[in-house]
Amino acid sequence: AIHKVLHKLNEPYKEVFWLRTFGELSFAQIGALFSKTESWARVTYYRAKIMIKEELQ
């Protein structure tokens, strides 16, 4: 079920969630990959988590 929900997520939410959860990258590393800040990565990850929770309910 989680894979279907992840597949539906738009970028960059999908990629950020994937990198953080499965790639075990820090928010600083994720931000650097996207040429963004650590805060951007953190906010994007938490928004993705909210979207996933809503889809799973």
Where are these predicted regions, by residue range?
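A short pre-motif secondary-structure segment
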Residues: 16-20
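Pre-recognition alpha-helix immediately N-terminal to the DNA-recognition helix
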Residues: 1-4, 14-15
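Helix-turn-helix DNA-binding module
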Residues: 7, 11-12, 23-40
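Short acidic-aromatic loop segments in the C-terminal HATPase_c
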Residues: 21-22, 46
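DNA-recognition helix of helix-turn-helix
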Residues: 33-57
